[in-house]
Amino acid sequence: MRPDTAPGAPLLRYRRQPCCIGDVGEEVRRTTYDRAQRRAYRRKVQLCLDVFETMLTKSRFDSDRPLSGMEIECNLVDGNYQPAMSNRHVLEAIADPAYQRELGAYNIEFNVPPRPLPGHTVLDLETEVRTSLNEAQIRAGSDGTRIVMIGILPTLMPEHLSRDGWMSESTRYAALNDSIFSARGEDIPIRISGPEPLSWEAATIAPESACTSMQLHLQVAPEDFAANWNAAQVMAGPQLALGANSPYFFGHRLWSETRIEVFAQSTDTRPEELKVQGVRPRVWFGERWITSILDLFKENIRYFPSLLPELSDEDPVAELAAGRVPALPELRLHNGTVYRWNRPVYDVLEVDGVGRPHLRLENRVLPAGPTVVDMLANSAFYYGTLRALSEDQKPIWTKMSFAAAHANFLAAARHGIDARLHWPDRGEVAAADLVLDTLLPIAHEGLRRWGVDAEVRERFLGVIEGRAKAGRNGATWQVATVQALEEDGMTRPAALAEMLRRYCDHMHANEPVHTWPC
């Protein structure tokens, strides 16, 4: 039984935030906006920010029983392991509101209900997620469709995204596509370096649909948000080095976590001239440590014009004055079109039908896959290090420049588990050594503070230890397997399809990726 539905437990529901391109969120009413709407939206977003600032000082945010949550973005493939543009039919077959459409017609998302971390929760979650995904696969697979958890579908090729039908049916997605290209005024060049460099011109935001991630949510008190966000930024590099799972895009071997660069380039609203001027990209690591969640929302408004200036009827000042919790839809919608790897979230948690404001930190660093046990090991490592680092009396971010944290993130995206990362008091160190010598003990201590049972800590952090010792994650396994198949005479497309077939078999077996044979 799920913790949030146990007898006598309060009924907990998030009001789904209209978030990034890949999230369904709330549908919009139009695909184009005039100048008056944009001016009115700018004023409304600022008004929402003013109300939010007041709430931070005067309102009681729900944080007594911090909850964690998870979203897993998945791909759909046919019997030949090629992209299946069939999410509408698949979702009808699954018939479970926990599964939603994503940007691409070959994508779906699984939303895991929020729950507390202590005790055996993560072990229970492993069983629940596996059961749900297996049931979804049975229902979706009547026509041979398979659900795949992976950072980028390796069999995805340009021709799949160059014809009609790649996008899910949604006014919201069409509006975002139009807004991004209106801002740019030209096609988006996709230029990615690596062992097999890629150059391609995108006439739509279709390449973004290739990027499927696992998103981790943590409910945080307002006074603790800055420390948690700073710690998450520090951990983004090590996190990504361990979890990289996207070495191929359009048949090219590129970065260990190519998803990072594909996402950044495919949603870039800046033409070349604005890049040269130093205009900030919407996919953004950030540029400084923060002292309040308000810093991030102020940056959103200061640096980024609206993409979807959709106005609501809510008067946030009147709502707050009446003692109700304002939804602040304009602030949230705008926040959802600034693509931070660690995103602040304002939301309203409904407890037994009563709305309570709360804040979440949404970690968007990791790719989906390879297995449920690997993803939960990644989440345990993240939640553990986050707890310990955010509570340190001498915070690590006071000993480390923000630029160094960003450099670690990019090095991890490029080189994965073979990356060398900068760490205070250690200088430049191999990512695997940093995990084994420094970060695993921190993660154990953090999970202990969360009240996570010892056997749970040992199971999931043991997976992280095994991965670091073996030097193998999803990206290294994919590359090694494709290389072996090509050495046996397979073409690249055939090798990618066969690799994906084996990947799916291992995924369902739920053995950690570092134990998989090539």
Ranges and model annotations:
Residues 8-518:
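Phosphate/nucleotide-binding catalytic core
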Residues 2-5:
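Extreme N-terminal basic, low-complexity initiation segments
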